[in-house]
């Protein structure tokens, strides 16, 4: 044991709680949306994509971590580590790029930079494909030799190896690629879209260009997506910050808890998206009841 057995027991209990909550709420989101035709809108396709991403994390990552925490180390070998790291990375990245697509959709629908543009089912499907392709370009490289997945923190889950700088894995280039393409760029797009969106909402309200009902509906949807983005940042920014600090301070000593806490706090992202969707979408709640 790297830390006390009680810490592994607490970790296992925490993962069990995430599975107990994360699987039902994400499955419920998928089931209710697919069951009720009026919920099958282009925007909701992207929200369904978030639920699928969260289920990847729950089924492919959380169950594995709960099992390994009972043993005090990662007992599933190289293949198990690759699979767990892949599913966790893929799920987190699909969620991030889905939020990018949602931000662009909100900007186009509210800001109207393209006249007479409607966000249709085809656009939503393109957005889904885009999110999966971009997520794969982050999750697949460690499987084929550009960096690798290794047990991290308390050695109960696997993530990308950004701290050993082992020879032959081009650690520096992948970490710079990951932080630039899969963190800074998507967040910059999100902040740009919502910055422009806030300006558009204020201008429309001042000019009374649209009916009050339409404005209220667009504001509610935009507020829901903004809260999802804030939730993503709250969950993943500590992990990204610690990972970057470790990468930039090679040789510095840090304990297993230092890396474990932000990594497992980030996993709560599999719960908050469906809860936000359920709590802030009246139409969904009515269909669910």
Curated annotation (Swiss-Prot):
PTM note: Phosphorylated on some or all of the serine and threonine residues present in the C-terminal region.
Membrane topology label: Multi-pass membrane protein
Superkingdom of source: Eukaryota
Segments on the Extracellular side according to the record's topology features: 1-7, 68-81, 145-173, 246-257
Any one annotated GO CC term: membrane
Keyword Chaperone in annotation: no
Molecular functions per Gene Ontology: 11-cis retinal binding; G protein-coupled photoreceptor activity
Positions bearing the site annotation: Plays an important role in the conformation switch to the active conformation: 84
Short name of one Pfam family: 7tm_1
Stretches of the chain found on the membrane's Cytoplasmic side: 33-44, 105-123, 196-223, 280-289
Modified residues (N6-(retinylidene)lysine): 267
Predominant location: membrane
Keywords: Cell projection, Chromophore, Disulfide bond, G-protein coupled receptor, Lipoprotein, Membrane, Palmitate, Phosphoprotein, Photoreceptor protein, Receptor, Retinal protein, Sensory transduction, Transducer, Transmembrane, Transmembrane helix, Vision
Localisation per UniProt entry: Membrane; Cell projection, Cilium, Photoreceptor outer segment
Main function: Photoreceptor required for image-forming vision at low light intensity. While most salt water fish species use retinal as chromophore, most freshwater fish use 3-dehydroretinal, or a mixture of retinal and 3-dehydroretinal. Light-induced isomerization of 11-cis to all-trans retinal triggers a conformational change that activates signaling via G-proteins. Subsequent receptor phosphorylation mediates displacement of the bound G-protein alpha subunit by arrestin and terminates signaling.
Protein family membership: Belongs to the G-protein coupled receptor 1 family. Opsin subfamily.
Name of this chain's protein: Rhodopsin
Gene coding for it: rho
């Amino acid at each position: 044991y790297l830390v006390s057995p009680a810490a592994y027991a607490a970790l296992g209990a925490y993962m069990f709680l995430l599975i107990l909550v994360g699987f039902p709420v994400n499955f419920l989101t998928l089931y209710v949306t697919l069951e009720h035709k009026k919920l099958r809108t282009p925007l909701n396709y992207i929200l369904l994509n978030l639920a699928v991403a969260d289920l990847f994390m729950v089924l492919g990552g959380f169950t594995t971590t709960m099992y390994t925490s009972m043993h005090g180390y990662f007992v599933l070998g190289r293949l198990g580590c690759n699979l767990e790291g892949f599913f966790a990375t893929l799920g987190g990245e699909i969620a991030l790029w889905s939020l990018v697509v949602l931000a662009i959709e909100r900007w186009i629908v509210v800001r109207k930079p393209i006249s007479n543009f409607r966000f249709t089912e085809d656009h939503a499907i393109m957005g889904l494909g885009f999110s999966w392709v971009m997520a794969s370009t982050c999750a697949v490289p460690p499987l084929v030799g550009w960096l690798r997945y290794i047990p991290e923190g308390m050695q109960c889950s696997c993530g990308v190896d950004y701290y050993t700088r082992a020879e032959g894995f081009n650690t520096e280039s992948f970490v710079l690629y990951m932080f630039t393409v899969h963190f800074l760029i998507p967040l910059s797009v999100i902040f740009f879209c919502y910055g422009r969106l806030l300006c558009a909402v204020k201008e429309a309200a001042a000019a009374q260009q649209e009916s009050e009902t339409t404005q209220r509906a667009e504001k509610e949807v935009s507020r829901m997506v903004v809260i999802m983005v804030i939730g993503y940042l709250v969950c993943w920014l500590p992990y990204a910050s610690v990972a970057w600090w470790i990468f930039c301070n090679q040789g510095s000593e840090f304990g297993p808890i230092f890396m474990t806490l932000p990594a497992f706090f980030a996993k709560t992202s599999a719960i908050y998206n469906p809860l936000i969707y359920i709590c802030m979408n009246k139409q969904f709640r009515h269909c669910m009841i």
